[in-house]
Amino acid sequence: MLGAHAIEVGPLGMLAINISLLAMVGWALLRAERGLPDGREWTLLAMLAIFGIFGRVLLEPLPNIQPVTVLVLLVGVHMGAKRSIALAAVIALGSNMLMGHGLWTLYQALGWSLVGCLGAFAATHLNTLPRIAGAAALCGFLFDWVISLSILHTLGPSMLPAYIIAGLPFDLLHAMGNLFFAAWLASPLADIINRHQVVTL
């Protein structure tokens, strides 16, 4: 399974991936900046990015358990889609610069961006810990399935269902890890964001 993600893209392909990720971060930051009341929320986002990057790197020995999915979901809920997209792309690129960067980085950025957007669009319903935890668990599966699409570059669509089924134990680990991180982070992160009076856009 791991070999399916080890795609040789060459220098030009890697440049295209890096430009795509940079464009994603730039677009999200520029769009979000238009409604920026002050600079404090950017400091908060930078701190969350650092936490997400180091959380992912340090928890690498635990298969598919990391705080990033929950962080991006909660930023989507409390700060909006644009800021969650920026956070998702920065964490994906920043952590993969340490762990290994390639085509999968783009899929991770897209998967976490989708999680953040879902958090933003469902924000009015994600107002209790059980709902946030349930959404976080489901987002573990969603993120992993988006990442699985990267095998289409090497194995083709006929292998995708088998690949997803083979990955279900790892998806379950991701979902369980997300339950833990949601219980740990949901309330404190909401309090921190509210203290900075961030307006959802």
Roles of regions detected by a PLM:
Residues 69, 73, 109-116, 179, ...:
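Alpha-helical transmembrane segments of multi-pass membrane proteins
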Residues 45-51, 76-78, 139-146:
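Small-residue-rich segments of transmembrane alpha-helices in multi-pass membrane proteins
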Residues 48, 84-95, 131-141:
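Central hydrophobic cores of alpha-helical transmembrane segments
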Residues 53-66, 89-123, 155:
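Interfacial aromatic-anchored transmembrane helix boundaries in multi-pass membrane proteins
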Residues 37-45, 80-84, 132-133:
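Membrane-interfacial loop-to-transmembrane alpha-helix junctions, especially the N-terminal start
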Residues 1-19, 105-109, 121, 125-201:
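Membrane-embedded alpha-helical hairpins and interfacial helices in multi-pass inner-membrane proteins
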Residues 2-74:
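Hydrophobic transmembrane alpha-helices
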Residues 68-84, 118-123:
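Generic transmembrane alpha-helix motif of multi-pass integral membrane proteins
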